[in-house]
From Swiss-Prot:
Name of the protein in question: tRNA uridine(34) hydroxylase
Role description: Catalyzes oxygen-dependent 5-hydroxyuridine (ho5U) modification at position 34 in tRNAs.
NCBIfam families, per the entry: PRK00142.1-1
InterPro entries, A to Z: Rhodanese-like_dom (IPR001763), Rhodanese-like_dom_sf (IPR036873), Rhodanese_C (IPR022111), TrhO (IPR020936), TRHO_N (IPR040503)
Catalytic function, reaction form: uridine(34) in tRNA + AH2 + O2 = 5-hydroxyuridine(34) in tRNA + A + H2O
Highest rank taxon of the organism: Bacteria
Family to which this protein belongs: Belongs to the TrhO family.
GO molecular function, one term: oxidoreductase activity, acting on paired donors, with incorporation or reduction of molecular oxygen
Protein's UniProt keywords contain tRNA processing: yes
Organism for this UniProt entry: Pectobacterium atrosepticum (strain SCRI 1043 / ATCC BAA-672) (Erwinia carotovora subsp. atroseptica)
Domain Rhodanese: 146-240
Signal sequence, start to end: none
Amino acid sequence: MPVLHNRVSNEELKARMLAETEPRTTVSFYKYFTIDDPKAFRDRLYIQLEQYKVFGRIYIAAEGINAQISVPNNQFDAFKTGLFSAHPALDQIRLNIALEDDGKSFWVLRMKVRERIVADGIDDPTFNPANVGQYLKADRVNAMADDPDTVFVDMRNHYEYEVGHFQNALEVPSDTFREQLPMAVDMLDDIRDKNIVMYCTGGIRCEKASAYMLHHGFKNVYHVEGGIIEYARQAKAQGLPLKFIGKNFVFDERMGERISDDVIAHCHQCGASCDSHTNCRNEGCHLLFIQCPSCAAKYEGCCSTQCQDEMKLPLEEQRAIRSGRENGMKIFNKSKGLLQSTLHIPAPAAKDNAE
């Protein structure tokens, strides 16, 4: 039996990836379709993708597939042929090619079977995820962005919205998609007659969100086809003005793709204009936050002096301090003025709070 998971350390895998000479292309794709046996489908696809030396993160569920990967350029055509033939629903599936890419976005292939390909918290047997809103290509997105009877709704997390969004888009301020869905219904209840345009990074969240809004009685619901990534690609290819300002946050080593030259966020430590996310260098923290080059030097890549000091302790002392701390992703939320971890970060500057 072939080994259907990785057995090599992250450190070694990352070193191997960095030593590669063959360029890679970062790609994302998703598809809602019925998979009768997700585990068997996952194992077959793993064997196939491993032979093409694909790295990345793929979630598979009975409702479909969600993938963010990198593919060696010399294997790309073979990868596409294999993917398109893996299931009838995947034939000619749209592949979102990264807008900014150094090929170093992933260093290992991880494929997991989950209950849902995006955690939505929906527990309603009458909900039909196939009944989605109308797709919008870039030209129609721009036309609707200038329409006063249209509201754009960002279905991404608050830290994604913070560094880039469509002009005048409504933020649904939450850390999770499952929280955003009912919040969006409540926030838009008084403007049901307007055109509602949902968008997200690559389309997977806004497609399901559009179905959720229709399920709750909204009529004029749309979503941006292929999300921000495909919108930006189409707009630039067609010479259209960009209605998305700032940076598109991505969930890999790049942490962002520049869409426009606008920098709309601020350093969480000093308030300087900045939209570069990073993770705190303290192994016991890894807080996701925005840090400018000056603060990166001052705090040595840490989110606070506490983490800066802790990082310099002997490893055994660091492990003892970390013992008992909650694990999981920690995110600085400027809108709440809180740090969702056991550690501390100074309050953001006043001008950051005023945003």
